[in-house]
């Protein structure tokens, strides 16, 4: 599918209605969850429900969803125009003084209390994000709403985000396209230095975005002390630095007989993709080359068997089987992939003991890898979509067995 075809597909969707549908689906689940309302602060969750990303979260963005009725988006007055232009939630309330805006309160928590009163959530059971908010926030919410009971809905939100609709998958196709561009350029510069490979990939991704995709945002989600305006990233590590897992690139030039691992990440309208490739620099030691070929075999196994209906543990077993056969049982990874979407690392983990049944629309990485401390690693990572009868592989590189 070409970039233009993907863009044409996206035009068929009513973006704001898709976000409204997510809210409606959440409301439909509230009786089962045993809650009367849900209050979200986590940037990925508030975006998932509202379609609004202020980029900088120094002032909280809050979505309050009652079991019945319309959801409310609460933002600082500074974000009034931005949220009005982009959010799918119609009822936007403001807090904090800024220019000539008319906030309902000076601070977010007083505003939440007013909204809870309007939505008749005072004295009701409230769902909260136990994996995100602090104890102080929990206590404030409970006090403001007079909730007799608070229910952690974190797992529900994680699972809701994991299954993507076709609109989200098209965005993932575009972010994957950018990582593919970046990876090809990183491979062309891999022998120069970690820094050269990394920056050349980032430049290529940014130039491609500017020429072909600049109508889409490439930001990610910040926190209360900063924001991520541009989420087109690459880092390449070499030799003994590869097992660090994630490290800033430096001036190190890879040596003959080592491996390099360039990692390209990209986001389009909030949806992230990951593309990683292990590159052999010349001839590597036989034992490590054996591990490299086992990695390719494990990856091929997963591509062949992965589909809706299989379990995460079955995927794991297929991915590591060639490692065991090749004598690397003592080096097996804890997982061979993870969910991607509004975060680079999200639910679920493709781990040995995870009996989660994969469903159509789930988006995960496939990355069966080995780590050899002090030497390097063998790992490719691809972003894939689980389909009824197989998978759709979104990421790629010019070849699989990479020698430079």
What residue ranges belong to the model's regions?
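Active-site neighborhoods and metal-handling regions in enzymes and metal-associated proteins
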Residues: 1-404
């Amino acid at each position: 599918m070409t970039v233009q075809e993907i863009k044409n597909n996206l035009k068929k969707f009513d973006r704001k209605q898709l976000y409204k549908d997510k809210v409606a689906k959440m409301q439909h689940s509230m009786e089962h969850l045993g809650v009367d309302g849900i209050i979200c602060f986590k940037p990925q969750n508030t975006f998932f429900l509202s379609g609004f990303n202020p980029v900088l979260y120094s002032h909280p963005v809050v979505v309050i969803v009652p079991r019945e009725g319309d959801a409310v988006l609460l933002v600082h007055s500074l974000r009034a125009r931005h949220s009005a232009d982009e959010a799918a939630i119609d009822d936007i309330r403001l807090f904090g003084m800024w220019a000539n805006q008319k906030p309902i309160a000076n601070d977010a928590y007083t505003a939440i209390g007013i909204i809870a009163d309007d939505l008749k959530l005072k004295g009701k059971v409230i769902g909260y994000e136990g994996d995100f908010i602090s104890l102080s926030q929990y206590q404030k919410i409970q006090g403001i709403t007079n909730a007799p009971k608070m229910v952690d809905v974190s797992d529900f939100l994680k699972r809701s985000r994991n299954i993507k609709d076709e609109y989200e998958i098209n965005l993932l196709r575009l972010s994957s396209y950018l990582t593919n561009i970046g990876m090809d350029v990183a491979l062309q510069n891999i022998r120069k230095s970690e820094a050269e490979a990394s920056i050349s990939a980032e430049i290529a991704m940014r130039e491609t975005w500017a020429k072909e995709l600049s109508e889409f945002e490439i930001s990610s989600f910040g926190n209360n002390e900063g924001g991520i305006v541009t989420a087109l990233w690459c880092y390449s590590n070499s030799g003994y630095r590869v097992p660090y897992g994630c490290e800033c690139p430096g001036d190190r030039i890879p040596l003959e007989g080592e491996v390099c691992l360039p990692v390209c990440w990209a986001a389009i309208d909030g949806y992230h993709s990951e593309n990683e490739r292990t590159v052999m620099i010349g001839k590597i030691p036989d034992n490590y080359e054996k591990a490299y070929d086992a990695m390719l075999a494990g990856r091929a196994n997963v591509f062949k068997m992965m589909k809706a209906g299989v379990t995460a543990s079955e995927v794991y077993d297929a991915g590591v089987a060639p490692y065991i056969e090749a004598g690397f049982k003592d080096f097996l990874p804890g997982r061979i992939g993870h969910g991607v979407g509004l975060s680079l690392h999200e639910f679920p983990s493709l781990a040995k003991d995870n009996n989660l049944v994969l469903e159509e629309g789930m988006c995960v990485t496939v990355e069966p890898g080995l780590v050899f401390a002090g030497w390097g690693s063998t790992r490719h990572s691809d972003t894939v979509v689980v389909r009824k009868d197989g998978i759709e592989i979104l990421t790629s590189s010019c070849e699989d067995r990479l020698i430079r």
